[in-house]
Amino acid sequence: MDINMTLVGQLIAFVVFVIFCMKYVWPPIIGAIEDRQATIADGLAASDRAAKDLELAQEKATAQLKEAKVQAASIVDAAKKHEAKIVDEAAGKAQVEKERILASGHAEIETERNRAKEELRKEVAVLAIAGAEKILERSIDAAAHSDILDKLVAEL
């Protein structure tokens, strides 16, 4: 194989080309590749952080949901206690009102009974006088014998 000037020229051109590529072409390509690697690494790291953040957010949401359920249960319990208190108060008020109405009714009945007794006593006194008049066949003066009538009314 003959080594001639063409081969040497090609060798020199190739070396110059390689040096040129290493000096001017290769660094931007390597820089772009390294930038792309860094971007991908940052994206993967961000993805991992986002996954961890999502997991933390889900745990926090679960904890808040549990807390909300506990609060809701306590609110429901408080409402039930309040309801029971209101019902008890209403029942107490109704009982007091019932007792008042019953007492009023009993007092009214007692008053009416006493009035009826008085009317009956008066009627009995009148009937007794009428009966005595018929028996004695004479009229008894009611004013003169009021003591006798009062005793008779008291006995009835």
From Swiss-Prot:
It is a single-pass membrane protein. InterPro entries: ATP_synth_B-like_membr_sf, ATP_synth_b/b'su_bac/chlpt, ATP_synth_F0_bsu_bac, ATP_synthase_B_chain. It comes from the Bacteria. GO terms for molecular function: proton-transporting ATP synthase activity, rotational mechanism; proton-transporting ATPase activity, rotational mechanism. F-type ATPases have 2 components, F(1) - the catalytic core - and F(0) - the membrane proton channel. F(1) has five subunits: alpha(3), beta(3), gamma(1), delta(1), epsilon(1). F(0) has three main subunits: a(1), b(2) and c(10-14). The alpha and beta chains form an alternating ring which encloses part of the gamma chain. F(1) is attached to F(0) by a central stalk formed by the gamma and epsilon chains, while a peripheral stalk is formed by the delta and b chains. Belongs to the ATPase B chain family. This is ATP synthase subunit b. The gene is atpF.
